[in-house]
Curated annotation (Swiss-Prot):
Pfam assignment, any one: VPS9
Regions annotated as coiled coil: none
Domain of life (superkingdom): Eukaryota
An annotated GO BP: early endosome to late endosome transport
Identification of the protein by name: UPF0507 protein KLLA0D01133g
GO molecular function: guanyl-nucleotide exchange factor activity; SNARE binding
Classification via PROSITE patterns: VPS9 (PS51205)
Family listed: Belongs to the UPF0507 family.
Domain spans labelled VPS9: 280-432
CC terms in the record's Gene Ontology section: early endosome; late endosome; plasma membrane; transport vesicle; tubular endosome
The species this protein was found in: Kluyveromyces lactis (strain ATCC 8585 / CBS 2359 / DSM 70799 / NBRC 1267 / NRRL Y-1140 / WM37) (Yeast)
Length: 1067
């Protein structure tokens, strides 16, 4: 039958595995080298191979997949280490050689491949997925499965999109091109100055003169006693450098030469000028004239601005909050002024600071007087030192005098100078007094000490440098007594509007602040005021007002769950913070809460009611975070209530491929494991990619392992899992009859030897499993090892489960005790069992029996081979369909029309589930090899019957010879009557007779011995056939039909759920 499949979508896989004529193919050299070898393939994505071309060769990558060098660069051949050194075992290799001799290394921690010697360039490539491709051709015989490492891009080739796809690359960019970040303007200026300096240094005579000029200038600057003196030296130096450079033809042609010389001189003299200016203006600096630190506590309302009008009715706290935010932004920018080492850099800081302070807020523009006051406030709060030195430098060392006297820069410097001039003794004394009062009030509130009523009443509008009002200070310090006093006795100063508008720099409302510091009493007071005094729309607006982290009140409700009943219905439970977390998600992650189960249950009930009241279905997808974590992933305990909701996806992986069960296994969430394992929708054997780990592989706690295995044991009598290297041995975990034990891999192979001895004609593929166990790990790649062991252990599960139904498994014993039990000799047969005389009619009957069964089982094997190939086709083509769909969506998402591109977003979900396909193929393979084992037994016994006929023929010939030579078999005459000749002849005859007699005896004995073997083997085979027929029917039902159908149904349910979630995302 033809051994190739319909064309595979991935060109590289199709070229290697699906060649109809390997002996005449362009890759025949590769096929001859790979004939009986074990290897793995690094396969770029199908999308890449179909959409890109190699710039150097001009060939499409799909065509390049039929060129030896490209293909061989993606194939790694592995030698079995046990062939040379029996005790050697590969654990994890990191360095590999491709088929054409190129070097690469695999970094398992971050799943990347790094190319090395032999490749034209060093590339770092991500491993996306690892799987095993079943062998379906007849020319690669090294293994039943080939490991496939799916990688993000090819290991070689200069990639550009195909011509017809260039339109997409122009819109979205070549995803394989190096994305260089645009340099900042400041970096560009620095580069120009450094390049200019390098040019000067490359001309020795110019470099010497320039160096001498700077050396002399620096010495004179150190001796200068006035700003004018420093400025004079600086100007003279600029002129000298300009003269030196203008006389040199190699430098005087440069563009913007004056600006370049200015920047260059500044670069060389900036530090010296700053040091000397500090000495000259030291006594004029604010920090030396006054107690500058005492001014830090100044409040915004204590400097004159148009945001605090005399008419209280026109006052807007919302505008003040916005202004405080602008001041804080400007403050952070002003603090960086000392880090700038250029005139333009410092001036840019001041200009940006002015721009931030001058922003129009809620229709209120900032006039000149307000701007000056805000700059004074900024200087007090920022505590930036050396401002007089900065002003002196900016006003005396400019590139041109007109640049700082007119325009925006002139206005900025004049305002800066006016702000510094504001600080004279009278104003400073006044500010200091106000700051002292502020600090006294705040300290009294924070320490819960008595506050002077008069002092408090005259400073009700003060705010800290963090933008906190008195109400906010009371809330954060848990001083609810003063808070109550303020709200009760100063209602006009703290009207409802101000309570609603009050925010700190994080834009958190007073209620959010109360929840953040767990001030339940304050939260209750505030919520009562809001619920009783506001309309429903105002309540919703306030409770859903986001802070700087885009979190609303609901994101903090776990801090005081008692508020939920009264305010829960007003929350927007689908609002997401800057991390993409909804309030429900945030509550589920509040692991430190003492009453966690109570909180999540109440909040979930409230959210379910909220969806019902809004006539909306519960939308699980919107409660996922950007990393793909669902509510099930993050819930620490109590998932019962979540599993009761419709449309919950219990198997959905996050962006790292981790399902909820894997998360529970990793973080020891035992109660969640016990609950979710009872859910019929669970696919407990899902594999994480690209690490290829199951939920059992993630366990580190024996209790967690036992919890999963106890639940699994209800479905499977024997569970084999988790190959790990411990105590210098490969060990596997086996769970049987409620007992978990770890056994070495060598002992399991010893166990299979025991089964082979005890059941020599068993139909189970014991020898195949022994070979698979022996070769585990030779690829040296952890993901491949886990995937190989996963499938091999599933086969061992079936074998041991069957043995468990026929007798004692002994798998609850310790390793040494089990080894003693398994150390049995070959069963001894009695003489009557070993030597049996069979008649030709019996042999004919056995041969007829064997030939009939051989023909029947060969038919069955052919059917299984065809069925397996069809299963492989279905598996591969299913992935091809998913790949094409995702490729289509990817291209659509790059469309230039945003409306069109948006329709392709958020739909590229992983709909492909390989478990049922792999299980179906694996189970068919197990049954096929069981049939092959029986066929081998038939052929072996047929060979013995042929040998029996040979010995039978020899025996008949010997009997014929005996009858011919000794027809009567009478006794010879006595020696007394014989002469010499008669005696000699009779002696020869006697010797011949004895020899023939011995040959007859030996031939008969051999025939009986073979007959005994045939008889015993025939009976064993007959029993084996009957057992296989019984096993086959049950196997069809349990492992071919029922389990696969059940698995496929559950998988399709997940696919449909993802479709529903996707549609919800686009509604």
């Amino acid at each position: 039958m033809p051994y190739h499949l319909p064309v595979l979508l991935n060109p590289l896989l199709n070229a290697i595995f699906n060649c109809p004529s390997p002996k005449t193919s362009s890759l025949k050299q590769m096929f001859s080298r790979l004939d009986d070898e074990r290897f793995f393939i690094l396969v770029p994505s199908t999308e890449t191979l179909l959409q890109f071309q190699d710039l150097e060769s001009g060939l499409e990558l799909a065509e390049l997949c039929y060129h030896y060098d490209f293909v061989a660069s993606h194939i790694v051949v592995i030698k079995d280490p046990t062939k040379d050194v029996p005790d050697q075992r590969s654990i994890y290799n990191t360095d590999f050689t491709t088929l054409n001799g190129r070097k690469l290394s695999i970094r398992y921690r971050n799943s990347t491949i790094v190319t090395g010697d032999g490749f034209t360039e060093r590339r770092k490539i991500t491993i996306k997925e690892i799987n095993l491709l079943p062998t379906f051709n007849d020319y690669l015989k090294g293994s039943n499965y080939t490991p496939i490492l799916h990688i993000s891009m090819p290991l070689c080739g200069d990639l550009v999109p195909l011509d017809e796809l260039q339109v997409f690359s122009k819109v979205a960019g070549n995803k394989y091109s190096k994305q260089e970040q645009a340099p900042l303007p400041f970096d560009e200026e620095q580069k120009k100055v450094l390049y200019f300096e390098q040019r000067i240094q490359s001309i020795s005579d110019v470099a010497e003169r320039v160096a001498l000029t700077f050396h002399l200038t620096k010495a004179r600057i150190k001796k200068a006693i006035s700003v004018i003196g420093i400025r004079t030296e600086w100007l003279n130096t600029r002129d000298s450098i300009r003269q030196i450079i203008s006389l040199d033809k190699r430098l005087n042609h440069l563009e913007d030469l004056d600006a370049m010389i200015y920047d260059y001189v500044e670069l060389k003299l900036f530090t010296d000028i700053q040091q000397q200016l500090s000495e000259i203006v030291e006594d004029q600096e604010l920090e030396h004239r006054f107690d500058f630190k005492a001014l830090r506590s100044i409040s915004l309302n204590q400097v004159p601005t148009n945001f605090y009008p005399k008419d209280e009715k026109s006052f807007s706290l919302a505008s003040v909050v916005e202004l405080e935010k602008s001041v804080n932004d400007a403050l952070e920018y002003l603090k960086s002024i000392d880090l700038k080492t250029t005139h333009s850099g410092k001036l840019e800081v001041l200009s940006t600071t002015m721009r931030l302070l001058s922003r129009e807020i809620n229709g209120i523009s900032t006039d000149a007087d307000t701007l000056l006051s805000l700059f004074v406030l900024l200087i007090c709060r920022s505590q930036v030192t050396g401002l007089v030195r900065t002003l002196t430098y900016l006003t005396n060392f400019e590139i041109s005098e007109t640049s700082i006297k007119f325009g925006l820069q002139g206005y900025v410097l004049s305002t800066f100078e006016a702000a510094l001039s504001f600080f004279h003794q009278d104003t400073v004394d006044s500010l200091t007094k106000k700051c002292a009062s502020n600090k006294k009030i705040w300290a009294s509130i924070q320490k819960h000490s008595k506050v002077e009523a008069e002092l408090l009443s005259s400073n009700l509008r003060i705010r800290t440098d963090s933008g906190e009002s008195l109400l906010s200070i009371c809330i954060q310090s848990h001083n609810n007594e003063v808070l109550t006093t303020l709200l009760a006795n100063f209602e006009s100063e703290f009207p409802l509007e101000d309570i609603l508008d009050d925010r700190d720099f994080a834009l958190s409302t007073l209620l959010i602040q109360a929840l953040q510091v767990q001030n339940s009493q304050a939260a209750a007071i505030l919520s009562e005021i809001i619920l009783k005094s506001c309309t429903e729309s105002e309540v919703r607006s306030y409770l859903n007002s986001p802070n700087l982290h885009n979190r609303i009140t609901a994101h903090y409700i776990m801090q005081d769950i008692s508020l939920l009943e009264s305010v829960g219905r007003y929350f927007n439970w689908e609002h997401k913070d800057i991390n993409g977390h909804t309030p429900l998600f945030a509550v589920f992650r509040s692991y430190d809460a003492v009453n966690y189960d109570e909180i999540v249950t109440k909040v979930l009930d409230q959210v379910v009611k909220w969806y019902a009241n809004n006539n909306k279905p519960f939308n699980f997808k919107i409660h996922e975070d950007p990393k793909g974590n669902t509510l099930l992933h993050v819930m620490k305990s109590g998932i019962e209530s979540l599993l009761k909701l419709p449309d919950v996806n219990v198997n959905k992986p996050d962006s790292k491929g981790l399902t909820p069960l894997m998360i529970y296994s990793r973080y020891n969430r035992i109660t969640n494991i016990e609950t979710i394992m009872k859910d019929e929708r669970l696919l407990c054997d899902l594999v994480q990619q690209p690490l290829v780990m199951t939920s059992l592989d993630f366990t580190k706690n024996p209790k967690v392992t036992k919890t999963i295995l106890d639940a699994t044991f209800n479905r499977e009598p024997v569970v084999i899992h988790s190959l790990r290297f411990e105590e210098r041995k490969w060990k596997i975990g086996i769970f049987s009859e409620g007992i978990f034990k770890k056994y070495s891999l060598d002992l399991i192979q010893y166990y299979l030897r025991y089964l082979k001895i005890m059941y020599p004609c068993s139909f189970h593929p014991v020898q195949l499993l022994t070979n698979e166990l022996r070769l585990l790990g030779i690829y040296g790649v952890p993901g491949v090892l886990r995937l190989q062991s996963y499938h091999t252990f599933k086969k061992l599960d079936m074998l041991f489960s069957y043995v468990n139904t026929r007798g004692k498994l002994w798998l609850g014993k310790d390793e040494e005790e089990l080894k003693v039990l398994l150390d049995v000799p070959t069963p001894y047969l009695s003489e009557s069992e070993r030597f049996i005389k069979l008649e030709p009619e019996e042999i004919n009957g056995i041969q007829t029996f064997l030939k009939y069964n051989l023909a029947e089982f060969q038919k069955l094997r052919n059917c299984l081979i065809i069925l397996k190939k069809l299963a492989i086709v279905q598996q591969i083509k299913h992935r091809d369909v998913i790949t094409m769909r995702n490729s289509f969506l990817s291209l659509g998402n790059q469309m230039s029309q945003k409306g069109v591109a948006k329709s392709f977003e958020n739909t590229n979900c992983a709909w492909s589930y390989d478990l049922s396909y792999y299980e179906f193929t694996r189970n068919l393979e197990y049954l096929e090899h069981s049939v092959v084992t029986l066929l081998n037994n038939f052929e072996s016994l047929l060979a013995k019957t042929t040998l029996w006929w040979k010995h039978f023929g020899e025996l008949m010939e010997l009997k014929k010879e005996w009858k011919k030579n000794f027809p009567n078999d009478k006794a010879p005459p006595s020696s007394a009557n014989r002469n010499f000749i008669d005696t000699y002849i009779e002696g020869k005859r006697s010797k011949f007779r004895n020899k023939l007699s011995n040959q007859l005896k030996m031939s008969s004995l051999n025939l009986k011995k073979i007959g005994g073997e045939i008889k015993t083997t025939h009976e064993s085979i007959a029993v084996g056939i009957n057992l296989f027929i019984e096993f086959k029917e049950q196997f069809y039902h349990d492992h071919i039909v029922k389990s696969i159908v059940d698995q496929r149904i559950r998988e399709n349910k997940q696919i449909m759920q993802q479709l529903i979630d996707t549609m919800k995302g686009h509604v």
